[in-house]
Amino acid sequence: MVESKAAMPQHIAIIMDGNNRYAKAHGLPTGGGHIAGKDNLDPLVEHCMDIGIRALTVFAFSSENWQRPANEVALLMTLLEQTVHDQLPRMLRHQISLRFIGDRDALTPHLRAIMQDAEEQTAHFTKMSLVIAISYGGQWDIVNACRQVAKQVAQGALTADAITQDDFARHLSLSDLPAVDMLIRTGGDYRISNFLLWQCAYAELFFTETLWPEFKAAELDQMIDIFIGRERRFGKTSEQVLGLSF
């Protein structure tokens, strides 16, 4: 368990990597790894709720994943539908908001409708937010925000010289949630793969060799304890963070 809740992260983001390697290691077809990964999400969501995490954002399908073999993409879309169906009763029971970010235009009308229904049914919950990134890319997110700001300028609602970081950020995904405190990537790779590029500006980064289907609450707790022990300066000196004067 987490040793202290004094400086708990409010927002954790996870790149859920390693499903295919898990399948190969266990003699399973590719789909078996993705199914195991889907099933692994449930206990971690409940654990995050139990320890007081305010928001959990998971990278389920990137904008680049459309380049994968067609049969794998079709399987992933089916599993995403199943994930929404599986998560919704749990979200309603625990009063967790279920949300989705990403380019919905690339998704089927059926999947979009399922996602919208789940969001509407859980929109009023404030205990915790589970955000699933589908057909998402950080660069897409930033370009989309640029378009929204450009429209405001074109309409005369905002001048180019007056644009602030806050003006821009409010058009990004997750603008109403705390900035990401912890970014975790499972599966052994050391990159963030175009995930929440703006929102992770000051996130503490954690990488693990553990494949996503084998990533458990105990390892998450170890990472959170390390996070709590880190000094987050946000550009300041250690003395400023500690409130010391000389």
Positions of predicted regions on the chain:
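Flexible, compositionally biased loop and terminal segments
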Residues: 1-246
